[in-house]
Amino acid sequence: ESAGLIPFPRV
């Protein structure tokens, strides 16, 4: 999921 700098999709 979101790490702050790079938004990752929550899968």
Curated annotation (Swiss-Prot):
The source's superkingdom equals Eukaryota
Instruction: Show the GO cellular component annotation of the record.
Output: extracellular region
- Kindly state which keywords UniProt assigns to this record, in alphabetical order: Amidation, Neuropeptide, Secreted
- Main localisation: secreted
Cysteines engaged in disulfide bonds, as pairs: none
Q: What is this protein called?
A: CAPA-Periviscerokinin-1
Q: Write out the GO biological process terms.
A: neuropeptide signaling pathway
Subcellular location per UniProt equals:
Secreted
Summarizing the function annotation, the protein's role is: Mediates visceral muscle contractile activity (myotropic activity).
Output the Pfam families linked to this UniProt entry.
Periviscerokin
InterPro entries (UniProt xref): Periviscerokinin
Which residues get modified to Valine amide? 11
Family the entry assigns: Belongs to the periviscerokinin family.
